């Protein structure tokens, strides 16, 4: 493989299936998907964790520790070791999780340079975009580097897990690895998604709408840059702006500028809607613990923003943040039926009809999803915390996912951004953006 000035060889050392250490009882062999799960695409969401050289620990010991603790953890997370059947339920047959071990012929730090991080991510994450009927529901890849550094990556069908579920699973798996020789840690995930959003019969989920022309890049905002954006928002009249709020407004405005620059046709002066959609974790709203398993997510969105509103930075920032705050408050008061992802998408499409728009793909909608505050940087298998955590979700046009990024004892934010090629070329050259990102 090649990327820029680096060429790296990889070798697959082994592939095996890891099954739960105790068989799943027959009474638990069917795990119903929730209505939310049924309407989520069968894509693979992957998270990778890079660790410095665990001094004095043999590779064989690391492999055995990970596999044994994974097997133990799957007793509690037994649906992960099963197969999705007809977009209806998971057959919890203990087929297991695929465990792949890979050798990467380079030093880890050589590919963790900023300009090569997308390449590093592609090397260590499982080579899946969708999860087919013959695939295991989840997959693990353990990668060894020449320097002794390693990466542990976990990928799972989005139909089974959201970001909160993945964070809980990784926390439990790591804790099981640390307490492998004892019974101090017994994972207790809450498998209640179907009781919150009951499954329905004959739900057909369409194929995932990837864009072949999309590219994905990461932009890192150090803590001081985020504080500047928050201070600017306060000057604009926003009370107590959050990190995610100011970055959502800032990045969506930069995206609009880039879109105008890349567009050959400027809509002849017409001001189309420019909705900003925000994903939301429903666990706090539903008063569920964070270890609740499934797709407990939905969206809310701005209703009145037009694409030409970006011309005034102050007014645009106020409009985006205030609109999203208002809509977030509304969603907290909805019934469970109205909280589902599908119900909110239907509401979104309905909101576009006043503009005579029947397909939301015809406009520049912008999706923001925050994985900040998920404790990914606390995932310690017994040899220290990760130095970098990376994420892959299949390319969605005009999408940004935010994650915490460590700066000493503080955290900035890493924004994983996906745009079509021409728009990305304009976006990454935006002078205002470059003032805030770290190299």
UniProtKB/Swiss-Prot annotation:
Catalytic residues of the enzyme: 158 (proton acceptor), 380 (proton acceptor)
UniProt GO MF annotations: 17-O-deacetylvindoline O-acetyltransferase activity
Keyword Coiled coil: yes
Enzyme class: transferase
InterPro entries xrefs: CAT-like_dom_sf
Entry coiled-coil feature ranges: 317-344
Induction: Inhibited by tabersonine, coenzyme A, K(+), Mg(2+) and Mn(2+). Induced by light with a maximum 48 hours after initiation of the light treatment.
Pfam families named among the record's database cross-references: Transferase
GO CC, alphabetical: cytoplasm; nucleus
Role: Involved in the biosynthesis of vindoline, a precursor of vinblastine and vincristine.
Protein name from the UniProt record: Deacetylvindoline O-acetyltransferase
Species: Catharanthus roseus
Gene it is expressed from: DAT
